[in-house]
Amino acid sequence: MPPRELSEAEPPPLPASTPPPRRRSAPPELGIKCVLVGDGAVGKSSLIVSYTCNGYPARYRPTALDTFSVQVLVDGAPVRIELWDTAGQEDFDRLRSLCYPDTDVFLACFSVVQPSSFQNITEKWLPEIRTHNPQAPVLLVGTQADLRDDVNVLIQLDQGGREGPVPQPQAQGLAEKIRACCYLECSALTQKNLKEVFDSAILSAIEHKARLEKKLNAKGVRTLSRCRWKKFFCFV
């Protein structure tokens, strides 16, 4: 009998003694919860939509509470980040606080062309965060950076008797004062520094989770050691 020809798509048969190749199991997906807080109309929703959907909202719509989910790869491992878009209005204070527990990282957002939103970082948002979640890392984020040099915006600020845009050194100084992981300015419209903001949030959350796990493991070892010492002491 002539030998059977093998097509290009058909692999050669394995010898009977050769075990089938094992498939490598995919690494488990790490979950991260990221909550955005800040005054209303500073652009929190726009940041999330621009990052997850590569789009920009046509008009402002106040948000009560929305969640978005996107998967990214960090050093080849899958990471699922849940983005929580919260309302900045006082009417939603109670609802907003419900999403703070178990948060891995916070983005404290203010508009660089709304000085009052910058002031509220220390007067409202940071105290609110620390009341419900004292340990999670916080990133200070200046939004609407594309408007910093916008002539119409500058005229409106001047005519309204308000201060000019928040200076970058002042924002950087606040980040150091409140011990934020970093200060970043970005624009949802132009997407400038947008990826850097969420990349920094993801890495900060991963590092925070690793520190918590290390502390938990160390605590378990100490507890186990004490139990063994007590048993040994009683036996003797």
Swiss-Prot record:
One of its GO terms (cellular component) is plasma membrane. Coiled coil: none annotated. InterPro entries: P-loop_NTPase (IPR027417), Small_GTP-bd (IPR005225), Small_GTPase (IPR001806), Small_GTPase_Rho (IPR003578). Its cofactor is Mg(2+). The keyword Metal-binding applies. A lipid is attached at C234 (S-palmitoyl cysteine). SUPFAM superfamilies: P-loop containing nucleoside triphosphate hydrolases. It is found in: Cell membrane; Endosome membrane. Its main location: membrane. It is a lipid-anchor. Plays a role in the control of the actin cytoskeleton via activation of the JNK pathway. This is Rho-related GTP-binding protein RhoV. It comes from Mus musculus (Mouse).
